[in-house]
């Protein structure tokens, strides 16, 4: 849900890219994993997998830091192959432009690093068995592989009163997480490691982001009332993300503590900082606070909603829909600023010998 600010943002700086929630802690864990994994002998490349790469901005710093650690452990010309993966509809052109153009790209820092991309869902096996030395996934596994059912009273199932829908989403979330870790267990080389940053729930089972999601739901209702959206389109509009508890995250490993040779080396959940709120406390600019969260929602969440239009991304109303929705969400959040509650889970998984 939360990604670093794009370069065209008026508040974008070199330092702000790392501030996507939880990345600092996750990158530190990834660097430790890079120190620990066994390395293949040259000329066999070291394989690093980035599961859920999106446009690449969240991958720049983690991949660069992991590659720097790996490079210190091997020859200067030992090839490091990075496989960026995402669903087929991902904008891989944007990903490759990020890797080519951004000064923080590992391609500019390590001449023996090489890039590849895979346009398939990571809820199946997408890389050969026993080939991945180091894996990374941030802000990706909270997205479900499919929408299990419709519900009409909110844009997010966590805030729906439809008990059957909530149960269906929970079942899908359990299946997806099981498949994700099982197939990574197959892909990882012996003693390979995978670091995952994803949405969690707090001690009360709350996924967070309530004010943002309520603002989106309210703005969509207004669009339907005003005639921009049809009621059947509104009913289809859902954001299929989930937060998982520590119990949920451990479930695939029960009762033996392993799945496909994979075990949990580290697992924690924590409350993440709302950096926009921290900024607001300094400048008290409510309009900027609302605009920043709305811009993030536009980048991370609105594309999913656009697909629910009768014409999908080609619908002639798509641009107007997104523009109006962003403005309405910004206005709602600016009218009553409050910190966004969010919980994250950070895990390091290791393959047995």
What are these regions (language model features)?
Residues 22-25, 172-176, 241-245:
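Soluble or luminal CAZymes and related metallo-dependent hydrolases
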Residues 190-314:
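Substrate-binding/catalytic lobe of Class I Rossmann-like enzymes that use SAM or dcSAM, i.e.
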